[in-house]
Amino acid sequence: MSGHSKWHNIQAKKGKVDAKRGKIFTKIGKEIVVAVKQGGPSADSNPRLRDVIAKAKANNMPNDTIERSIKKASGELNAVDYETITYEGYGPAGIAVLVDVLTDNKNRSAGNVRYAFTKQGGNMGSTGCVSFMFQSKGQIVIEKKDGLDEDELMMMALDAGAEDFESEDEVYVVATSQEDFGTVREALEAEGLEFLEAEIKMVPDTYTAIDEDTATKFQKMLDVLEDDDDVQNVYHNAEFPEGWEE
Protein backbone atom coordinates (compact mmCIF):
# COMPACT_ATOMS: atom_id res chain seq x y z
CA MET A 1 0.00 0.00 0.00
CA SER A 2 1.09 3.60 -0.51
CA GLY A 3 2.68 5.74 2.16
CA HIS A 4 5.01 4.84 4.98
CA SER A 5 4.27 4.70 8.67
CA LYS A 6 7.97 4.61 9.60
CA TRP A 7 6.92 2.90 12.82
CA HIS A 8 10.34 1.49 13.61
CA ASN A 9 12.25 4.49 12.31
CA ILE A 10 10.25 7.04 14.25
CA GLN A 11 7.40 5.80 16.40
CA ALA A 12 9.38 2.99 18.01
CA LYS A 13 11.50 5.72 19.60
CA LYS A 14 8.32 7.00 21.24
CA GLY A 15 7.69 4.77 24.24
CA LYS A 16 11.16 3.27 24.39
CA VAL A 17 12.14 5.56 27.24
CA ASP A 18 8.76 5.04 28.91
CA ALA A 19 9.14 1.27 28.89
CA LYS A 20 12.74 1.47 30.05
CA ARG A 21 11.90 3.65 33.03
CA GLY A 22 8.61 2.09 33.99
CA LYS A 23 6.46 5.14 33.26
CA ILE A 24 4.05 3.84 30.66
CA PHE A 25 1.55 2.35 33.13
CA THR A 26 1.39 5.60 35.09
CA LYS A 27 0.70 7.56 31.91
CA ILE A 28 -1.97 5.17 30.65
CA GLY A 29 -3.54 5.17 34.12
CA LYS A 30 -3.98 8.94 33.84
CA GLU A 31 -5.59 8.51 30.43
CA ILE A 32 -8.03 6.00 31.93
CA VAL A 33 -8.95 8.47 34.68
CA VAL A 34 -9.71 11.20 32.13
CA ALA A 35 -11.68 8.84 29.88
CA VAL A 36 -13.84 7.60 32.76
CA LYS A 37 -14.54 11.10 34.04
CA GLN A 38 -15.62 12.17 30.56
CA GLY A 39 -17.70 9.16 29.56
CA GLY A 40 -18.28 6.90 32.54
CA PRO A 41 -16.69 3.65 33.79
CA SER A 42 -18.30 1.25 31.30
CA ALA A 43 -16.16 0.44 28.28
CA ASP A 44 -19.31 -0.74 26.48
CA SER A 45 -20.76 2.78 26.43
CA ASN A 46 -17.52 4.79 26.51
CA PRO A 47 -15.59 4.61 23.20
CA ARG A 48 -12.67 6.63 24.53
CA LEU A 49 -12.28 4.26 27.48
CA ARG A 50 -12.38 1.29 25.08
CA ASP A 51 -9.55 2.85 23.09
CA VAL A 52 -7.44 3.52 26.18
CA ILE A 53 -8.01 -0.02 27.50
CA ALA A 54 -6.90 -1.38 24.11
CA LYS A 55 -3.77 0.74 24.38
CA ALA A 56 -3.20 -0.52 27.93
CA LYS A 57 -3.51 -4.15 26.88
CA ALA A 58 -1.20 -3.58 23.91
CA ASN A 59 1.37 -2.38 26.46
CA ASN A 60 0.80 -5.46 28.67
CA MET A 61 -0.79 -3.46 31.47
CA PRO A 62 -2.24 -5.93 34.04
CA ASN A 63 -6.03 -6.13 34.24
CA ASP A 64 -6.04 -5.36 37.95
CA THR A 65 -4.08 -2.17 37.27
CA ILE A 66 -6.60 -1.18 34.60
CA GLU A 67 -9.51 -1.86 36.96
CA ARG A 68 -7.86 0.11 39.75
CA SER A 69 -7.51 3.12 37.47
CA ILE A 70 -11.19 2.86 36.50
CA LYS A 71 -12.24 2.68 40.17
CA LYS A 72 -10.01 5.63 40.96
CA ALA A 73 -11.72 7.74 38.32
CA SER A 74 -15.17 6.54 39.40
CA GLY A 75 -14.70 8.09 42.82
CA GLU A 76 -14.16 4.83 44.66
CA LEU A 77 -10.58 5.90 45.26
CA ASN A 78 -9.05 9.37 45.53
CA ALA A 79 -8.68 10.80 42.03
CA VAL A 80 -6.87 13.87 40.75
CA ASP A 81 -8.41 16.22 38.20
CA TYR A 82 -6.22 16.36 35.11
CA GLU A 83 -6.25 18.98 32.35
CA THR A 84 -5.48 18.00 28.77
CA ILE A 85 -3.14 20.39 26.95
CA THR A 86 -1.30 20.15 23.63
CA TYR A 87 1.86 22.22 23.21
CA GLU A 88 3.28 22.95 19.77
CA GLY A 89 6.70 24.00 18.67
CA TYR A 90 9.89 23.33 16.77
CA GLY A 91 12.77 21.05 17.60
CA PRO A 92 16.33 21.47 16.28
CA ALA A 93 16.46 22.16 12.53
CA GLY A 94 12.79 23.20 12.58
CA ILE A 95 11.32 19.76 13.32
CA ALA A 96 7.56 20.09 13.92
CA VAL A 97 6.60 18.77 17.36
CA LEU A 98 3.31 18.23 19.21
CA VAL A 99 3.35 17.40 22.93
CA ASP A 100 0.22 16.08 24.67
CA VAL A 101 0.13 16.44 28.44
CA LEU A 102 -2.28 15.45 31.20
CA THR A 103 -1.52 17.61 34.20
CA ASP A 104 -2.83 18.87 37.52
CA ASN A 105 -0.48 21.87 37.28
CA LYS A 106 -0.29 23.51 33.86
CA ASN A 107 2.34 26.04 34.95
CA ARG A 108 4.68 23.21 35.90
CA SER A 109 4.01 21.38 32.65
CA ALA A 110 4.47 24.47 30.48
CA GLY A 111 7.81 25.20 32.14
CA ASN A 112 9.04 21.64 31.77
CA VAL A 113 8.02 21.40 28.11
CA ARG A 114 9.54 24.78 27.30
CA TYR A 115 12.81 23.71 28.94
CA ALA A 116 12.91 20.52 26.85
CA PHE A 117 12.44 22.53 23.65
CA THR A 118 14.98 25.27 24.36
CA LYS A 119 17.66 23.00 25.83
CA GLN A 120 18.29 21.42 22.41
CA GLY A 121 17.90 24.52 20.26
CA GLY A 122 14.16 24.35 19.67
CA ASN A 123 11.36 26.64 20.75
CA MET A 124 7.73 26.43 21.78
CA GLY A 125 5.30 28.09 19.42
CA SER A 126 1.74 29.36 19.51
CA THR A 127 -1.33 27.15 19.17
CA GLY A 128 -1.73 26.08 15.55
CA CYS A 129 1.86 26.73 14.49
CA VAL A 130 2.50 23.09 13.50
CA SER A 131 -0.71 21.13 14.19
CA PHE A 132 -1.91 21.79 10.62
CA MET A 133 0.93 19.52 9.46
CA PHE A 134 -0.61 16.49 11.22
CA GLN A 135 -3.77 14.42 10.94
CA SER A 136 -5.47 12.35 13.63
CA LYS A 137 -5.27 8.69 12.60
CA GLY A 138 -5.74 5.28 14.15
CA GLN A 139 -2.68 3.04 14.18
CA ILE A 140 -2.60 -0.67 14.97
CA VAL A 141 0.76 -2.45 15.07
CA ILE A 142 0.92 -6.24 14.87
CA GLU A 143 4.05 -8.32 15.33
CA LYS A 144 5.00 -10.64 12.48
CA LYS A 145 4.70 -14.27 13.54
CA ASP A 146 4.81 -17.68 11.91
CA GLY A 147 1.37 -18.61 10.66
CA LEU A 148 0.23 -15.01 10.23
CA ASP A 149 -0.32 -14.55 6.49
CA GLU A 150 0.38 -11.03 5.25
CA ASP A 151 -2.15 -11.06 2.41
CA GLU A 152 -4.91 -12.45 4.61
CA LEU A 153 -4.20 -9.89 7.31
CA MET A 154 -4.15 -7.05 4.78
CA MET A 155 -7.50 -8.07 3.30
CA MET A 156 -8.94 -8.53 6.79
CA ALA A 157 -7.87 -5.01 7.76
CA LEU A 158 -9.02 -3.36 4.53
CA ASP A 159 -12.36 -5.17 4.58
CA ALA A 160 -12.89 -3.88 8.12
CA GLY A 161 -12.36 -0.31 6.93
CA ALA A 162 -8.61 0.34 7.25
CA GLU A 163 -7.14 3.08 5.06
CA ASP A 164 -3.66 1.64 4.68
CA PHE A 165 -1.55 -1.43 5.43
CA GLU A 166 2.25 -1.51 5.69
CA SER A 167 4.67 -4.42 6.08
CA GLU A 168 7.83 -3.37 7.91
CA ASP A 169 10.83 -5.34 9.14
CA GLU A 170 9.23 -6.99 12.16
CA VAL A 171 5.68 -5.64 12.20
CA TYR A 172 2.55 -4.92 10.19
CA VAL A 173 1.08 -1.44 10.57
CA VAL A 174 -2.62 -0.83 9.97
CA ALA A 175 -3.74 2.79 9.52
CA THR A 176 -7.34 3.91 9.92
CA SER A 177 -9.34 7.10 10.04
CA GLN A 178 -10.09 8.31 13.55
CA GLU A 179 -13.76 7.46 13.01
CA ASP A 180 -13.15 3.86 11.87
CA PHE A 181 -10.41 3.01 14.38
CA GLY A 182 -12.68 1.25 16.88
CA THR A 183 -14.45 -0.80 14.21
CA VAL A 184 -11.19 -1.99 12.63
CA ARG A 185 -9.59 -2.75 16.00
CA GLU A 186 -12.58 -4.79 17.15
CA ALA A 187 -12.69 -6.71 13.85
CA LEU A 188 -9.02 -7.68 14.20
CA GLU A 189 -9.47 -8.54 17.88
CA ALA A 190 -12.36 -10.82 16.92
CA GLU A 191 -9.89 -12.77 14.76
CA GLY A 192 -7.72 -13.39 17.82
CA LEU A 193 -4.98 -10.93 16.88
CA GLU A 194 -2.86 -9.24 19.54
CA PHE A 195 -1.41 -5.76 19.13
CA LEU A 196 1.91 -4.16 20.00
CA GLU A 197 0.14 -0.83 19.72
CA ALA A 198 -3.44 0.28 19.15
CA GLU A 199 -4.24 3.96 19.54
CA ILE A 200 -5.25 7.24 17.96
CA LYS A 201 -2.24 9.42 17.20
CA MET A 202 -1.22 12.48 15.24
CA VAL A 203 0.49 11.48 12.00
CA PRO A 204 2.47 14.03 9.94
CA ASP A 205 1.45 14.66 6.34
CA THR A 206 5.12 14.52 5.34
CA TYR A 207 8.41 13.65 7.05
CA THR A 208 11.59 15.73 7.13
CA ALA A 209 14.92 13.91 6.89
CA ILE A 210 17.47 14.96 9.52
CA ASP A 211 21.21 14.33 9.78
CA GLU A 212 22.95 12.46 12.59
CA ASP A 213 23.93 15.55 14.59
CA THR A 214 20.35 16.81 14.54
CA ALA A 215 19.08 13.32 15.36
CA THR A 216 21.30 13.20 18.46
CA LYS A 217 20.06 16.58 19.68
CA PHE A 218 16.45 15.75 18.93
CA GLN A 219 16.60 12.37 20.67
CA LYS A 220 17.88 14.13 23.80
CA MET A 221 14.87 16.43 23.59
CA LEU A 222 12.53 13.45 23.19
CA ASP A 223 14.14 11.72 26.17
CA VAL A 224 13.50 14.74 28.40
CA LEU A 225 9.90 15.06 27.24
CA GLU A 226 9.08 11.37 27.51
CA ASP A 227 10.65 11.17 30.97
CA ASP A 228 8.17 13.80 32.20
CA ASP A 229 5.23 12.16 34.02
CA ASP A 230 2.83 14.78 32.63
CA VAL A 231 3.74 14.10 28.99
CA GLN A 232 1.47 11.51 27.41
CA ASN A 233 2.48 11.63 23.75
CA VAL A 234 5.09 13.29 21.58
CA TYR A 235 4.50 13.50 17.83
CA HIS A 236 6.91 14.87 15.24
CA ASN A 237 7.74 14.84 11.55
CA ALA A 238 11.44 13.94 11.75
CA GLU A 239 12.81 11.03 9.76
CA PHE A 240 15.89 9.71 11.53
CA PRO A 241 18.89 8.63 9.42
CA GLU A 242 18.82 5.01 8.31
CA GLY A 243 20.63 2.84 10.82
CA TRP A 244 21.09 5.69 13.27
CA GLU A 245 21.36 4.76 16.94
CA GLU A 246 21.49 7.20 19.82
Swiss-Prot record:
Its main location: cytoplasm. Keywords: Cytoplasm, DNA-binding, Transcription, Transcription regulation. GO terms for biological process: regulation of DNA-templated transcription. It is found in: Cytoplasm. InterPro entries: Integrase-like_N, TACO1_YebC-like_2nd/3rd_dom, TACO1_YebC_N, Transcrip_reg_TACO1-like, Transcrip_reg_TACO1-like_dom3, YebC-like. It holds the Pfam family TACO1_YebC_N. One of its GO terms (cellular component) is cytosol. It comes from the Bacteria. The keyword Cytoplasm applies. The keyword Transcription regulation applies. One of its GO terms (molecular function) is DNA binding. NCBIfam families: PRK00110.1, PRK12378.1, YebC/PmpR family DNA-binding transcriptional regulator. PANTHER family: TRANSCRIPTIONAL REGULATORY PROTEIN YEBC-RELATED, TRANSLATIONAL ACTIVATOR OF CYTOCHROME C OXIDASE 1. Belongs to the TACO1 family. This is Probable transcriptional regulatory protein CLK_2466. It comes from Clostridium botulinum (strain Loch Maree / Type A3).
